[in-house]
Structure formats: C-alpha cells, structure tokens
C-alpha cells in the first residue's frame, strides 16, 4: 500500500473553515488554494483526507 502515492490538491480557500480542518490542511502540507502535494498512501493520510474531503481533490498515482 505504501508504494502508491496520492496527489492532494486544495480546491477551496480556508475562510470560514473550522480550526480543526485548517490544522489538518496544514498538516497535509497544503498552503494555498490550488496548491498540490504528493503523499504516500497510508491509513493516516487517508483519514486526514476524509476529514477535509469537501476541501481537497485526490488523485491516485503509481510510484
């Protein structure tokens, strides 16, 4: 499972978003709208993505 990668892109701005979700977005390494990061596909990252699923777009990449 760890050999897969996820491309996570922030699709919405953070104005009006709860503090917990903002901290999760920052922990994923996202900074601004349309910013993307590549993360390993782990259960921890999947849980973070599920928490902010309305704010991000996820693409699966093969490593």
Swiss-Prot record:
GO molecular function terms listed in the Swiss-Prot or TrEMBL record: structural constituent of ribosome
Keyword Heme: no
Family assignment from sequence similarity: Belongs to the universal ribosomal protein uL30 family.
Superkingdom of origin organism: Bacteria
GO biological process terms, semicolon-separated: translation
Gene3D superfamilies assigned: Ribosomal protein L30, ferredoxin-like fold domain
A single GO cellular-component term on record: cytosolic large ribosomal subunit
Keywords in alphabetical order: Ribonucleoprotein, Ribosomal protein
Species this protein is from: Natranaerobius thermophilus (strain ATCC BAA-1301 / DSM 18059 / JW/NM-WN-LF)
Protein name: Large ribosomal subunit protein uL30
PROSITE patterns in the cross-refs: RIBOSOMAL_L30 (PS00634)
Subunit structure: Part of the 50S ribosomal subunit.
UniProt lineage: Bacteria, Bacillati, Bacillota, Clostridia, Natranaerobiales
PANTHER family referenced in this protein's UniProt entry, alphabetically: LARGE RIBOSOMAL SUBUNIT PROTEIN UL30M (PTHR15892:SF2), MITOCHONDRIAL RIBOSOMAL PROTEIN L30 (PTHR15892)
